[in-house]
Amino acid sequence: MSNQSKKGKLFLALLVPVCILNACTSTGKKPGNADSSKKEETRKVQYLSEPLISSIYTADPSAHVFAGKIYIYPSHDIDAGIPENDNGDHFAMKDYHILSMDSIGGKVTDHGVGFDIKDIPWAGRQLWAPDAAYKNGTYYLYFPVKDKKDVFRIGVATSTNPAGPFKADSEPIAGSYSIDPAVFTDTDGKTYMYFGGIWGGQLQRWITGKYDANGSKTDSKQEDAPAINCKVALLKPDMKNFDGKVKDVLIVDSLGKPLLTKDHNRRFFEGSWMHKYNGKYYFTYSTGDTHFLCYAVSSSPLGPFTYKGVFMKPVQGWTTHHSIVEIKGRWFIFYHDTQLSGKTHLRNIKVTQLQHNADGSIKLIDPFLQD
């Protein structure tokens, strides 16, 4: 789930679009020409991909293949009239619309509301980025939402249908906190949940193991210390509880040293995902306020993960919450931007191909077409 920063606002301001056919135009003042600032310059922005759906605003797409069909579990963005802030209060989502498609490029079906915040007994506000999984005839929907004390927890809901409706458990997952659950089932049948996000995701307020309501609003504030890590927990066979302690997802550089708090171009911020390719585990994530999607690789789903680089350049809008899935032997990344609205809290989901190079690296993706 995205937060809003001054850098994000500046980035968006440079690219606010008005959609025209399959391209867009944005207007802005000419740099370094204050005397003629009233004259607006129009330039064309061409996008790599088009929105998958335009009838509603969607973001944070978690895509999976269930029973041969592609199902997408996105956030459902709404305009709640709440002023933007770095805490992300303007992301006031209340339900999930579950989408499906038979193939990439095919018709997208909106199955309507599959889950609503009013059906979560312990929920307060802000139903953010979900994920889903399947096991033994049951579909599991994992969701972050603030409880009645305004603390993010992660809950689970179940259904016999991938499109829902889903029924929430009466309590959040014990030991869970923060946002952005991403659930990965390995080839040995073990299932892991990766989760967490700093700033509005509150991960920095759990440094001591207990929630600090008066803690930092951003990160650890220790610039030369190791950055706050994403978290991972093994799930029990019931898919509803953690099996053991929550662990750090350690990201290290080529020398094996942890990435530091001040390393905003590489350190973890939010929006993690896990996929396995040629026996290696690819931990992908957003750097948040610098807008990159990065990846780190390990021989274990628990890490440590060695940072490898950026695999997607910044999109229009704020951070890029994504998912990566293999479909009929090809890999795709689902992501979002703000092409339809030009507003950071009203986003639209997209998809494009993701390619692994022969050496295992991921080919860099530019979300814009260059002239």
Feature roles, as predicted:
Residues 25-371:
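Carbohydrate-active catalytic/glycan-binding domains of CAZyme proteins
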Residues 21-23:
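C-terminal motif of bacterial Sec signal peptides marking the signal peptidase cleavage site
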Residues 2-11:
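Bacterial N-terminal signal peptides that target proteins for export
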Residues 10-18:
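Sec-dependent N-terminal signal peptides
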